[in-house]
UniProtKB/Swiss-Prot annotation:
GO molecular function, one term: 3-oxoacyl-[acyl-carrier-protein] synthase activity
Catalytic site: C119, H261, N291
GN (gene name): fabH
GO cellular component, as recorded: cytoplasm
A Pfam family assignment: ACP_syn_III
E.C. number(s) listed in UniProt: 2.3.1.180
Protein function: Catalyzes the condensation reaction of fatty acid synthesis by the addition to an acyl acceptor of two carbons from malonyl-ACP. Catalyzes the first condensation reaction which initiates fatty acid synthesis and may therefore play a role in governing the total rate of fatty acid production. Possesses both acetoacetyl-ACP synthase and acetyl transacylase activities. Its substrate specificity determines the biosynthesis of branched-chain and/or straight-chain of fatty acids.
Protein name, as recorded: Beta-ketoacyl-[acyl-carrier-protein] synthase III
Lineage, broadest ranks: Bacteria, Bacillati, Cyanobacteriota, Cyanophyceae, Synechococcales
Naturally occurring in which organism (per UniProt): Prochlorococcus marinus (strain MIT 9312)
Length: 335
């Protein structure tokens, strides 16, 4: 599916927010649990530490804090927000977490729903919300990416337990008739490679009455083929971004910032090199937070905005990629 340019209504980016739990899990602490080391983890992933949810944390609370922070950057009356899209693979309520966030915010006029696309989730949610705004259905939207993957990690598997952290990020976007800062997008899925990274269901069979079986649902820990995911990312992400540049009549030289899903520093560097984007234009906070799935892109963006790195009218190329396998790209102008 490819993006279509709408001339009548455009999208403006008005605010950003993020939240991470207080609890820090360092590489040194992990090395006390599994056979690894700080040097080994950093050399292969770029991660030094990650934030992990405690007993008092959940996805709803993290998403709420990120959304509230984004709203506070705007001058909006919360009652004027009419759309909330939450990207998450780890909802606090399996039937949907977005309505709880809507209620806690007091955004009673907003339609609220979850969207699941794993590490591509925030980008897919941003594209979805932007198309709703461009179509005239809604005027103000909060797009959130939040995940708590620490709850689904096998902490005895050193290949995966070193990667993931918890957190949330959000953007506030608004429909406008004056300009369009959502410059273009592209989205892809390849379900045939889905087994490279998944979190499959796990059913426990119980006999309840005579010969009637009851399946008590649950999930297995995250399963990942790291080598295949790496090869997928460094091949497909540069291709989709290069295609997007051609569609939007931009070049990589015109990009002020490249924000990729924070999966692995080697992936970030490789994609930048293939696109000939200098390392100083590649934003990363992977070392501090690890892979927070749907939260990574808005976490990086909010940090850069609040540190005055991203400025008004900066051109940002962004790409999310991961389980599904799914991947996508968007080109935006901040402001």
């Amino acid at each position: 599916m490819e993006g279509i340019k709408f001339n009548q209504i455009g999208v403006s980016f008005k605010g950003s927010g993020s939240y991470v739990p207080d609890q820090i899990l360092t590489n040194e602490t992990i090395s006390q649990k599994v056979d690894t080391s700080d040097e080994w983890i950093k050399s292969r992933t770029g991660i030094s530490e990650r934030r992990i949810s405690g007993l008092g944390d959940n996805v709803n609370d993290m998403a709420y804090e990120a959304a509230l922070s984004a709203i506070e950057m705007t001058n909006w009356d919360i009652k004027t927000i009419d759309l909330i899209v939450l990207a998450t693979s780890t909802p606090h309520d399996l039937f949907g977490s977005a309505p709880s966030i809507q209620a806690k915010l007091g955004a009673h006029n907003a339609v609220a729903f979850d969207l699941t696309a794993a590490c591509s989730g925030f980008l897919f949610a941003l594209i979805t919300a932007s198309q709703f705004l461009k179509g005239g259905s809604f005027k103000r939207a909060i797009v959130i990416g939040a995940d708590q993957l620490s709850s689904f990690v096998d902490w005895n598997d050193r290949r995966s337990c070193i990667l993931f952290g918890d957190g949330a990020g959000a953007l506030a976007i608004e429909a406008t008739n004056e300009f369009d800062n959502f410059l273009g997008f592209d989205m892809r899925t390849d379900g045939e490679r889905g087994s490279f990274l998944n979190l499959p269901s796990k059913n426990n069979k119980d006999l309840i009455i005579d010969n009637i079986d009851f399946l008590n649902g649950g999930f297995s820990p995250i399963q990942m083929n790291g080598q295949e995911v790496y090869k997928f990312a460094v091949r497909e992400v540069p291709i989709i971004l290069d295609n997007l540049f051609r569609k939007t009549n931009y070049t990589s030289d015109e990009v002020d910032w490249l924000i990729l899903h924070q999966a692995n520093q080697r992936i970030l560097d490789s994609v930048g090199d293939r696109l000939k984007i200098p390392r100083e234009k590649i934003l990363s906070n992977l070392a501090k937070y690890g892979n927070t799935s749907a939260a990574t892109i808005p976490l990086v963006m909010d940090e850069a905005i609040r540190n005055n790195r991203i400025k008004q009218n900066d051109i940002i190329a962004t790409s999310g990629f991961g389980a599904g396998l799914s991947w996508g790209a968007a080109l935006i102008k901040w402001g």
